[in-house]
């Protein structure tokens, strides 16, 4: 995933935009993982994990974004897709050795706290997101990101986040909904949008498939 917007308060809201190669297979949200009962998310059919996991009974969600930095060794590398599943299920961020993972940002959110673990391939950085509306991108909590500068003020001012994703895809670096046709013919684009709302008595998960077909 490439973009996550979080709004704290009595109603915790998360919106994620998943950018990926259009030919990478996936399926929509469900309880796909017997090892994590009660956890819902879309599943990456290549690696088996997820980019956003929700545990409704625990009033908790976790989101995974690709990061920048030093890649893991190919001989020992493992998928990052299990990180959001484990975090949503256990309510804990990973401890210990992270060197088997490529760089990432992992957000763990509930009604009391929103935590961020950023791993650049060399050292982990742990922080809490501030109260209000924040935006996490592939460079983390980055106020200098073109996407953050373009869209964070709009999300802060808007009561209808869905309206902000109903725009034409663009190859612009600052666009929220993207579409890049690469020289080799492959398509890298925003494939789906997830909006999760967590309240003391209710959790909702809205999933929007942005693709007309899985081949782009």
Describe these PLM feature segments.
Residues 1-216:
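N-terminal nucleophile
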């Amino acid at each position: 995933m490439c973009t996550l917007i979080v709004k704290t308060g009595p109603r915790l809201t998360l919106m994620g935009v998943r950018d990926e190669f259009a030919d990478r297979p996936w399926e929509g949200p469900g309880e796909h993982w017997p090892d994590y009962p009660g956890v819902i998310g879309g599943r990456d059919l290549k690696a088996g994990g997820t980019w956003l996991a929700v545990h409704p009974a625990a009033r908790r969600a976790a989101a995974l974004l690709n990061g920048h930095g030093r890649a893991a060794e190919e001989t020992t590398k493992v998928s990052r897709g299990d990180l959001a599943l484990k975090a949503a299920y256990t309510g804990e961020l990973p401890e210990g050795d992270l060197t088997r993972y490529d760089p990432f940002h992992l957000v763990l959110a509930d009604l009391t706290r929103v935590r961020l673990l950023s791993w650049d391939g060399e050292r982990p950085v742990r922080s809490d997101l501030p109260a209000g509306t924040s935006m996490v991108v592939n460079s983390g909590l980055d106020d200098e990101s073109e996407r953050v500068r373009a869209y964070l003020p709009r999300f802060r001012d808007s009561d209808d986040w869905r309206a902000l994703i109903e725009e034409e895809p663009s190859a612009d670096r600052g666009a929220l909904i993207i579409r890049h046709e690469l020289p080799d013919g492959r398509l890298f684009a925003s494939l789906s949008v997830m909006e999760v709302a967590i309240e003391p008595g209710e959790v909702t998960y809205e999933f929007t498939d942005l693709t007309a077909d899985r081949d782009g």
